[in-house]
Amino acid sequence: MNDTTWSDKLRLRSHFGFTLMPFAKNMKAAQMFDSSSQRELLRGLQLWTDVRGLCLVSGPPGVGKSITLRRFVYGLDQALWRVIDFSYLPSTPTGFLRSLCRKLGLPMRMHGADLFDQAQSYLVSHQQDHGAHPLILVDDGEGLPVPVIDLLRRLTSSDLDSDDHFSIVLSGTEDLLATLAHPGLEPLRTRFSYVQGLRPFGLEDTRNYVRFNLERADTPPKLFNASAGRPRSINKLAVQALIQAAVQGRDEIDGDFMNALILSHPLFQGPPGG
């Protein structure tokens, strides 16, 4: 019921008097709400650009890791940084190297060793040749197997580790942390120059997030007091509540309405999450 069509959104906006649809997930980076934990992560990433190297971001699903990384990338000087981001992560080292070479505009090679050598050589020399420091952004990394994650370390190993010719940000859930605990990845664990976990919203952040979305939609009423601490879950419940309220002809949504909705929602039995 959360997957609404454009005409459905128009009807919802008309029912509540919104000029924009609140709780959207496709907002521009500069317009996004940031919690105290997200601000800490963003500031840490900005300071880490002076250090560079390997960075690890972790946190439960739906707490805003990808959104915060988008804000971080949005704020980078494109003349000084070249961001190579992965929206699809191959599950084999050769597949990862092929995807990396494709994004770098490099030719395909038959053997994995040749793919590795040309990608590493290109990344190591890119800043000297073009002036921009390469940044590989690997988001949703919890599904990566150990050999692919170790490949990231091996890519950065050159010139006896004397300089960080390019940087990598690896982000994922607790499952990624469990994979990183593998004994074979100990050399990688020791090389992260910055590690930060992203926390779910606290109660005050949740209130501010709801208020932020409603003010952006140009509507004055208070929608509800608070929900769970994960932005993705808040969005799901908020949109569900808006639709259900419109179906019932309600103009206001209060705590009792939200409690009843959560209890009847098949995906939110108990405290909201996911």
Where are these regions (language model features)?
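Walker A/P-loop nucleotide-binding motif
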Residues: 51-71
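Conserved AAA+ ATPase "sensor/coupling" helix adjacent to the nucleotide-binding pocket
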Residues: 102-104, 174-175, 183, 201-218
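Mid-core helix/loop region of P-loop NTP-binding domains shared across ATPases and GTPases
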Residues: 13-14, 92-95, 107-151, 159-164, ...
